[in-house]
């Protein structure tokens, strides 16, 4: 089948949407499907390159850091998509490219499915100081989106519940986004662990709490810095891998708390290098409750890293307490779980690491693509039945006329 995936975010940006899109495209192509990406150019110039169509856009960082809005119509490229005649459109974002996705689906008379990646009510502080007003607006806009698509995809039961609470008007399927598990092969674990630890001058005995992700206010990394103040004397290092608009704020916070000597900020790391950082850690930590699914959780597990994360609904089917990690609700629970890990014998830790890696199988990109393939086929068939009914009804009116 021919699949058009639309997204406001694409490489070189680093986030869960980009990871999901790239992995889905790769796996669908391996299964013999034709896949094109429609996204926004980093300039006002529209062009196509290696099956990716870039529509001209302008900076919209005043709305959200790194955001862009389409300005160039790119008529020839748009016409090329219509002539390519996709079988289905899969939109990944709710803004510029969504409206292009809707227009293409209508013109080609094909289904439009949409993945809801973002809990927007956790991001309303970027454009409104009033949380209740922001939540009401998000609910309204989400319902509007749901009226324009044939089906929505929730990466986790957390998002499925949220969408139902919003009162959306279309079917919802829970399909976790997939990752390439081979990137986290155990054969590379020892080499990567030693290389990264040498680079940042950490010895083998140091307990390293690893955070990987974008540094933004909604990620609540400040909480990890506050907890680090309590554990730094016990030979524990907090390693924060990633960049973002909140990096300098976090550096200042670390200085205020007196933890700069036990916190490592790596800054932005290239996507090709991110996988090599996981083995450097002993536990993966996160204080965020704004994740829809949290692909970094899946990546950490795939690398054999148990989780120590703030309790969140998106982790309900992911964390098996005491087996592949822990969820905490308070500082006391965080400190207790960390102490539990440190007091384990080496063979117990290895057992947890092994089980963590095993539990990541549910996030295989092959499983992800297989589920998407089935959904696409079902939506295409339903759209065909709908068209046939419409034609039959029109034919009946002609006869009666």
What are these regions (language model features)?
Residues 19, 207-230, 245-251:
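A conserved mid-protein helix/loop that constitutes part of the nucleotide-sugar donor-binding site
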Residues 306-309:
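Short hydrophobic beta-strand element within catalytic cores of glycosyltransferases
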Residues 39, 53-56, 135, 139-191:
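Donor nucleotide-sugar binding/catalytic pocket of nucleotide-sugar-dependent glycosyltransferases
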Residues 249-269:
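Nucleotide-activated donor-binding/catalytic signature segment of Leloir-type glycosyltransferases, i.e.
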Residues 289:
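Aromatic "clamp/platform" in nucleotide-sugar-dependent glycosyltransferases that forms part
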Residues 321-332, 339-346:
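Conserved acidic donor-binding segment of nucleotide-sugar-dependent glycosyltransferases
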Residues 1-56, 373, 390-401:
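N-terminal subdomain of nucleotide-sugar transferases
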Residues 266-269, 276-281:
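Short alpha-helical donor nucleotide-sugar binding micro-motif in glycosyltransferases
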């Amino acid at each position: 089948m021919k699949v058009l995936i639309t997204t406001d975010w694409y490489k070189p940006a680093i986030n869960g949407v980009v990871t999901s899109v790239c992995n889905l495209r790769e796996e669908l192509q391996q299964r013999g499907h034709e896949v094109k990406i429609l996204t926004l150019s980093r300039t006002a110039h529209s062009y196509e390159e290696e099956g990716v169509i870039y529509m001209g856009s302008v900076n919209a960082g005043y709305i959200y850091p790194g955001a862009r809005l389409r300005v160039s119509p790119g008529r020839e490229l748009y016409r090329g998509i219509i002539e390519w005649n996709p079988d289905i459109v899969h939109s990944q974002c709710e803004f510029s490219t969504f409206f292009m996705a809707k227009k293409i689906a209508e013109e080609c008379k094909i289904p439009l499915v949409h993945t809801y990646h973002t809990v927007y009510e956790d991001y309303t502080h970027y454009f409104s100081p009033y949380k209740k007003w922001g939540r009401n607006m998000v609910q309204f806009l989400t319902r509007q989106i749901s009226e324009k698509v044939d089906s929505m995809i929730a990466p986790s039961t957390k998002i499925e519940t949220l969408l139902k609470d919003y009162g959306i008007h279309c079917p919802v399927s829970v399909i976790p986004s997939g990752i390439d598990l081979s990137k986290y092969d155990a054969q590379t674990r020892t080499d990567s662990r030693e290389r990264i630890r040498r680079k940042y001058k950490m010895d083998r005995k140091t307990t390293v709490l690893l955070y990987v992700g974008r540094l933004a206010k909604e990620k609540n990394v400040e909480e990890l810095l506050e907890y680090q103040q309590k554990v730094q004397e016990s030979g524990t290092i907090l390693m924060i891998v990633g960049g973002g608009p909140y990096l300098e704020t976090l550096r200042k916070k670390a200085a205020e708390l007196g933890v700069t000597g036990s916190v490592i900020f790596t800054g932005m790391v290239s996507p090709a290098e991110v996988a090599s950082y996981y083995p450097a850690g002993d536990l993966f930590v996160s204080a965020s409750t704004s994740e829809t699914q949290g692909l970094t959780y899946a990546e950490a597990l795939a690398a054999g890293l148990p989780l120590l994360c703030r309790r969140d609904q998106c982790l309900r089917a992911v964390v098996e307490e005491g087996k592949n990690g822990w969820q905490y609700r308070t500082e006391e629970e965080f400190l207790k779980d960390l102490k539990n890990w440190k007091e384990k014998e080496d063979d117990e830790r290895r057992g947890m690491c092994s089980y963590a890696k095993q539990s990541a199988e549910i996030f295989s990109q092959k499983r992800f693509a297989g589920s998407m393939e089935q959904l696409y086929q079902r939506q295409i068939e339903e759209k065909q039945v709908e068209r046939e009914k419409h034609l039959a009804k029109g034919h009946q009116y002609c006869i009666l006329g």
